[in-house]
UniProtKB/Swiss-Prot annotation:
Gene3D superfamilies: Survival protein SurE-like phosphatase/nucleotidase. GO terms for cellular component: cytoplasm. Belongs to the SurE nucleotidase family. It is found in: Cytoplasm. Keywords: Cytoplasm, Hydrolase, Metal-binding, Nucleotide-binding. Pfam families: SurE (PF01975). This is 5'/3'-nucleotidase SurE.
Length: 253
């Protein structure tokens, strides 16, 4: 199995390095990751400037000022030859649950892999300690995929509780929960008196009931949520069409 491995925490982050070490025990792994933390970069691409890369002695590649999506795009289309069999993103330091997937560079890297035609996993740890647990879970899933490919055409967003492996209860297939809207902005002043702003933490849990990714992780399970790239709200199409007809938009300007 050939694996393109990326993340949004940066090429030297403990999550990606722990996972790369574990994956290399049974797979051909190419790390292509940002040279710095790009958390929250979502699906952004660098289009108005060139991208430089640096290759370390162990073969890992850092994309200077690159986003997670840049890294996967370059990895698939230029840097990994032959091309990968699968794209894996993570292990993220912190969860990507519920609405987090909108902003997550970890999920975005996997989404870019899927957009380019490859199976893809995004892996996050609900903490900053037991990366080995998340790595073991990921390796188990990838070994299973080698034996029997999963042909859903979807991204698997995997969240692992920050526990020793023997305390993980199992795996649940879940849906995304939701958070309350975030509203915190943290102002500061620089030495010259100019105001600086920091984006605050995410909103608290809103829909975290049974069946959600929040609930599974809180209860000590691994959460696997299938995600897809198509954002069309199919159930709303008829509602919008009926509304346009009723208000006359499109018939009178």
């Amino acid at each position: 199995m050939r694996i393109l491995l990326s993340n949004d925490d940066g090429v030297h982050a403990p999550g990606i390095q722990t996972l790369a070490k574990a994956l290399r025990e049974f797979a051909d792994v190419q790390v292509v990751a940002p040279d710095r933390n790009r958390s929250g970069a979502s699906n952004s691409l660098t289009l108005e400037s060139s991208l430089r890369t640096f290759t370390f002695e162990n073969g890992d590649i850092a994309v200077q000022m690159g986003t997670p999506t840049d890294c996967v795009y370059l990895g698939v289309n230029a840097l990994m030859r032959p091309r990968p069999d699968i794209v894996v993103s993570g292990i993220n330091a912190g969860p990507n649950l519920g609405d987090d997937v909108i902003y997550s560079g970890t999920v975005a890297a996997a989404m870019e892999g899927r957009h380019l035609g490859f199976p893809a996993l995004a892996v996050s740890l609900d903490g900053h300690k037991h990366y080995d647990t998340a790595a073991a879970v990921t390796c188990s899933i990838l070994r299973a995929l080698c034996k029997e490919p999963l042909r859903t055409g979807r991204i698997l967003n995997i969240n692992v509780q920050d526990l020793p492996l023997d305390q993980i209860k199992g795996i649940r297939v879940t849906r995304c929960g939701t958070r309350h809207p975030a509203d915190q902005v943290i102002p500061q002043q620089d030495p010259r008196g100019n105001t600086l702003y920091w984006i605050g933490p995410p909103g608290g849990k809103c829909d975290a009931g049974p069946g959600t990714d929040f609930a599974a992780v809180d209860e000590g399970y691994v959460s696997i949520t299938p995600l897809h790239v198509d954002l069309t709200a199919h159930s709303a199409q008829d509602v919008v069409s009926d509304w346009l007809n009723s208000v006359g938009v499109g018939t009178q300007w």
